Amino acid sequence: MKFQTIKGTKDILPSEIHKWHYVENTVRGVFQRFGYNEIRTPVFEQTALFQRGIGETTDIVGKEMYSFQPDPESESLTLRPEMTAPVMRAYLQHSLSGTSPATKVFYISEIFRKERPQAGRQRQFWQFGCECIGSDQPEADAEVILLMTEIYRQLGIKNFTLRLNSLGETESRLAHREALQTYLKPHFDLLDEISKTRFEKNPLRILDSKNPALAEIIAGAPHITEFLDDASKAHFQTVQTYLKNAGLDFTVDPTLVRGLDYYSRTAFELVSTDLGAQDALAGGGRYDSLATVLGAKNSSAAVGFAAGIERLLIIMEKLDLFQAVLPPAPLLFIATQSPVAKEWAFQTVNRLRTEGIHVALDLLGRSLKAQMREANRTHAKYVLIVGEEELSTGRFQLKHLQTSEQVELSEADIFTKMQTETTQDLG
């Protein structure tokens, strides 16, 4: 039997992991500059957490979750299909509001959804995102949006459009739902099967349809902005003012909705034409009622966003943004010419590594010529060729592989030079 990766999953190989590290480190750095701390939650949760948190009528809960029962007596568990509900669960369980009135956390996590695999969309994939819990102020919305766009700018992606909308409060959404159903009823026979299913359960999601045959119908539908309460209007206007003052361009799109039921008021999405049909880079919004939906006595205002790493990597590859991102290379490669030299090299490599220096040596017993090829393949900066003569004299030739410049050093000098160069690289 030939074992392979499961459909919708992907190995991240050593030849590409440096790109992932670059993205993750950049993302983590921006989050930390904005005052966010990392959170990690279990990969599976109670199924009820997502049913209540995301909403029974959503596509995710309806058909995309990987759920299982460890045994007939136990409750159903689910591999997390998103991170907001688990983060809110952790916030409530550990009383994080007592630590800080505004809890700001970020995550870089694996997500699981039963979706049709395609470019940038897997069944097991990675997301990064953040949640600001405890503030109902519009500046929290604006900060999260600015944080999201700053991540993409730091990664070199500047060709994007920010779409904004407000979904209002519960009363606004109920009034809009009724008006939307009234509008869509005469067009019901023209709807596709997915939209017909959504008509009763969640008609707002019909506005999110990517079916071009429905574009004209959707264009004429009543907008939720027509039903906003005064407080939501003022909140949304203030968010826009903060973004304008920050110099961030955006488009107010009254057709923008989010695929999860917990969203209220501000909703946003970052899109790029460089991704083709699947143009969304990231998205998020405010979800002030999620805490009470999950059983909390008091509401906890919150806003956040999430973004897929695989899709980000696709666009970065397309824009050639990894050209200067190289795998970590050894500072020094020690090549040996005799058994005695091997023994010395092994001890020296170990000493250098304990000093925090990236150094490599041959583990295959290859010839000197093959070792030199390996040094070049790994892009080592220096190579040190060690034979019995070098060991007897205590003098070693250190060669710079790019310039071919050579210097003669003692063993102590080698350590000093490697330590100095490592310190400079870190600085």
UniProtKB/Swiss-Prot annotation:
It is an enzyme of class 6 (ligase). Gene3D superfamilies: Anticodon-binding domain, Bira Bifunctional Protein, Domain 2. Signal peptide: none annotated. Keywords: Aminoacyl-tRNA synthetase, ATP-binding, Cytoplasm, Ligase, Nucleotide-binding, Protein biosynthesis. GO terms for molecular function: ATP binding; histidine-tRNA ligase activity. Its EC number is 6.1.1.21. It catalyses: tRNA(His) + L-histidine + ATP = L-histidyl-tRNA(His) + AMP + diphosphate + H(+). Pfam families: HGTP_anticodon, tRNA-synt_His. GO terms for biological process: histidyl-tRNA aminoacylation. It is found in: Cytoplasm. PROSITE patterns: AA_TRNA_LIGASE_II. InterPro entries: aa-tRNA-synth_II, aa-tRNA-synth_II/BPL/LPL, Anticodon-bd, Anticodon-bd_dom_sf, His-tRNA-ligase, HisRS-like_core, HisRS/HisZ, HisRS_anticodon. SUPFAM superfamilies: Class II aaRS ABD-related, Class II aaRS and biotin synthetases. Homodimer. This is Histidine--tRNA ligase. It comes from Chloroherpeton thalassium (strain ATCC 35110 / GB-78).
